[in-house]
Amino acid sequence: MSAPISVVIPTLNSANSLPATLLSLMEGLDAGLICEVVVSDGGSTDASGAIALAWGAEIVTGAASRGGQLRRGVAATRGAWVMVLHADTILQEGWAAQVKAAMQQGPLCFSLAFRARGFAARWVAAWANLRSDLFGLPYGDQGLVLRRSDYDRSGGYPDQPLMEDVALARSIRHKIRRRPACAFTGADKYQRQGWLRRGAKNLGLLLRYL
């Protein structure tokens, strides 16, 4: 059986983080899960494109907008399943076995963890994971794996710069189930803006969007 999953990664000047993200996908290739990686670039001026090509990824380009980039990226894929992963997210070792065991149960995401120490990082991640469990509304930082048919029926990602992940999650018929494997994501925005301020901003955006 051919590998079922196409991976889509949106990038915008992501050269510093992209190699580690791509490296974490290698176990999915070894497990026969991943058939292709599509990098959807929003006009990077750094080496993001060169890095993607060096790793064997396909590149699609267009205007910088997370939703638009993801929509273009998914449109370029051929797999029966789609995995969406941010360019600063590293999947925990062992993720491929968990996906392989659970994917027939429907769409899934990973458990959020930040590449940062301290109580604030753990608290924000715990809240995000609880929200995913209760409402089936993971953020894009947690990754997403779903059938292409479910994606198509949902209407796909809207071309919008924010909350595109929540918009898609709300339109999917099946609840998104969280797996124990962690998606370790960068904490730069939280560390620059402050954990409390950034967390409150995200919550406010979510409440206004819903």
Segments the model singles out, each with a brief description of its role:
Residues D150-S154, Q160-R178, C182:
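A short, conserved alpha-helix in the catalytic core of glycosyltransferases
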Residues T61-T77:
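Glycine-rich, basic loop-to-helix element that forms the pyrophosphate-binding segment
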Residues P4-S6, E36, A167:
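Cell-envelope/extracellular polymer assembly enzymes that use nucleotide-activated donors
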Residues N13-L29:
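Short, well-formed alpha-helical segments that are part of the catalytic scaffolds
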Residues V82:
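Short aromatic/hydrophobic "clamp" motif used to bind/position activated sugar donors
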Residues D41-G49, T89:
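A conserved acidic beta->alpha catalytic loop
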Residues E93-A120:
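Conserved donor NDP-sugar-binding/catalytic core segment of glycosyltransferases
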